[in-house]
Design a protein with these regions (language model features):
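Short, surface-exposed ligand-recognition loops at beta-strand->loop->(often short) alpha-helix junctions
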Residues: 38-43, 102-104, 192-198, 284-287
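Vicinal oxygen chelate
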Residues: 22-29, 112-192, 214-255, 262-265, ...
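Amphipathic alpha-helical segments
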Residues: 42-58, 110-117, 196-212, 296-299
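Sec/Tat signal peptide C-region and signal peptidase I cleavage site
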Residues: 17-21
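Bacterial N-terminal signal peptides
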Residues: 6-16
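Conserved catalytic-core motifs of GNAT/GCN5-like acyltransferases
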Residues: 58-64, 211-220
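Mature N-terminal segment immediately following signal peptide/propeptide cleavage
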Residues: 28-63, 68-69
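N-terminal secretory signal peptides that target proteins for export/translocation
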Residues: 1-4
Length: 332
């Protein structure tokens, strides 16, 4: 199959993300806003002190409700002390929470600065028969399959070394993305795995009022039958943390304001609960927890924790698709 034919096939069967696309109207429920990512750490204060180093323009160490914290825009990273290093995707079973990250105005320049600072880079393979690299733009362009890589090599195509995405390996093994977009450094996403991306998108929209951007997740659109379950996954592509490649599509995502819950597929399911792992859960806020909890109970959403005091406020914990834990905190 030629490069052109395979490329057309991949575009038809799967999708790439469409940044900040026009959005569908949000469901008519009380507003919920993205609030925080909660991590487990053997040294919360040291973990909180780390993030202002790579992201000095947007992150500051602070505290919130008794937790060591990082404030970045209107979002927080919170840290709970644990006795032993929490499991991540390298040391334990995979959860539905893959990583979180920042948009940066020049990701290659950021990567060079990270290396100069002595920060650990989580490298990726550029091909099944290739080498480890820092950034996606250090690989052949277009997130190619191995077949496409061989065809591009034969034609003399070279990496652009401009923009793209890469990853830091942060405190306790956290994976943190550095992805070029826009002109301002900002925390912008949590990246998820879901066995059925379209089903997850619909769940987030239905129960949490998230918006589904138009054009995102075209391959994750439901068929005429209305069945959101994934029947066909795209072939693996590179760069990839696994030398065997990474199945990227059908992908998708939803937004809470300017924060994206981005989704890649996890064929076969089996994702475990994130509780106690490196990223324990993420959270949204509501102005009236009683109203939100009552609605979610009417919708038969599973509760992991009933309403309880949360510092000077209140919170509850629910379970979403693929066992993801989502906290609902009250912010008046």
């Amino acid at each position: 199959m030629t490069l052109i034919i395979r490329t057309v096939f991949v575009i038809v069967v799967c999708v790439s993300f469409v940044a900040r696309a026009q959005e569908r109207p949000a469901s008519a429920i009380e507003p919920l806003r993205f609030h925080h990512v909660h991590l487990n750490s053997v040294d919360p204060a040291a973990a909180a002190a780390y993030y202002p180093k790579p992201f000095a323009a947007s992150a500051v160490a602070t505290t919130l409700n008794g937790f060591a914290a990082v404030k970045t825009g209107n979002v927080y990273l919170l840290f709970t002390r644990v006795a032993t290093t929490p499991q991540n995707e390298l040391t334990g079973p995979q959860t539905s929470i893959w990583h979180f990250g920042w948009n940066t105005p020049d990701s290659q320049a950021y990567d060079k600065r990270f290396r100069a600072m002595g920060l650990e880079i989580a490298q990726m393979w550029d091909a099944a028969d290739g080498k480890l690299v820092d950034m996606s733009s250090d690989t052949l362009p277009g997130l190619p399959t191995q077949e496409q890589i061989l065809e591009m090599r034969a034609k003399g195509v070279q990496p652009t070394h401009q923009g793209g995405f890469g990853y830091l390996r942060g405190p306790d093994g956290a994976m943190i993305e550095n992805a070029q977009a826009g002109t301002t450094e900002r925390f912008n996403h949590v990246h998820m795995y879901h066995e059925h991306p379209r089903c997850a998108m619909e769940w987030y929209a239905t129960h949490l009022g998230a918006t589904i951007p138009q054009g995102r997740g075209a391959a994750a659109e439901p068929p005429a039958t209305g069945d959101c379950h994934t029947k066909l996954y795209a072939p693996p592509t590179w760069p990839s943390f696994a030398k065997t490649g990474f199945v990227r599509d059908p992908s998708g995502g939803v937004n809470f304001g300017d924060i994206s819950i981005s989704i890649r597929p996890w064929p076969g399911g089996g994702l475990v609960s994130p509780r106690g792992k490196i990223v324990d859960h993420w959270a949204v806020s509501t102005a009236d927890l009683d109203v939100t909890v009552a609605r979610l109970k009417r919708e038969n959403v599973k509760f992991l924790e009933e309403m309880h005091p949360w510092g000077a406020s209140r919170a509850a914990m629910i379970e979403g698709p693929d066992r993801v834990a989502i906290e609902i905190v009250e912010v008046k």
